[in-house]
Amino acid sequence: MLLLHGFPTAGHMFRDLIPQLADRFRLFAPDLPGFGQSDMPAPSAFTYTFENIANIIDRFVEVIGLHHFAIYVFDYGAPVGFRLAVRHPDRLTAIISQNGNAYEEGLSDGWNPIRAYWQEPSLPNREALRSFLAPETTHGQCTHGVPDVTAISPDGYWLDNFYLARPGADEIQLDLFGDYKSNVALYPTFQNYFRTHRPRFLAVWGKNDPFFLPGGAEAFRRDIPGAIIHFFDTGHFALETHAKEIAAAIRDFLAR
């Protein structure tokens, strides 16, 4: 199983999930380029787009010899993983989406500042997005919509903030905010893949996510009638509070 993380985290977001699945599956959780412990070349040396990131992950999968595999996608990992699915529909055995969106109705008003940058990629609109990189924002993303915030271990968001504070990381993330519009433009392509190939599909969704709404999870059934949808009473980073429950859902799903 290929595990693809989101913003602003890295492969460490799967630290509580992997031990609960490792007895049954081979699990690979690479840090995307510019994230975690992967290389972070300057934007002058590498153009940070989701297409380029998908190209690298595609090559990574080839190098490690994954020929048939499931993907677990979250947030930014979803458009990367869905690109791989479109390219190699015969290689994917299942898709698990944790707040990984592919439908317009899944995007909340929380995206409005980023939408403004898509519509007018001016310097003021770019600078307005820096607040998304602030430590308190990372903490807020982890705790928003979580009934009991004491259930969240601080190691996750502290490590995320460490990575975000590296020199040059801010410009990389701002570039990716701007390029996220390329993912929205591909939603019809992703949806056509779902309709055409009807992959085995499980959504495990934090229903209180301020960015990716429950409607985005429910929309998968429009193109994959057999999709299984589970909602959890938590926020964006559902694994921080519900890793055990999500692992159980995955085991049950893949055993069918």
Where are these regions (language model features)?
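Catalytic histidine-centered segment of alpha/beta-hydrolase-like enzymes
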Residues: 234-247
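Conserved HGGG/HGGXW glycine-rich cap/lid loop of the alpha/beta-hydrolase fold
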Residues: 1-37
